[in-house]
């Protein structure tokens, strides 16, 4: 539903899944991603903190979503910290790491990471940005502008 653009239905089903199984950190993390896309990174971060309390040895999905929350909130240093905790880098963590590094003025390292992200994912910047379903144009352009500046 999220990828179909039906955010109302996605919210309903995520909240219902969490109601049915409140200790499922996967659903909590996916709900937090949805909240970030809707421009509510603070609410999303509350969900991530809850997931980490439930499982302190959390999955990479929780850490990746934590990094996304920090990026959308403009806390690029904390975003990097979250992505570095991950066991396995993902295309999402690589693109956001590159964007965070660029936002922090570390263009050289950002360029290296972006190259890896593009090669491993087979995606260019535009295709990756279009896969991020931000509803606020400012959130989408923040990511896009950082990646294009590299």
Predicted segments, located by residue:
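Alpha-helical protein-protein interaction modules
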Residues: 6-150
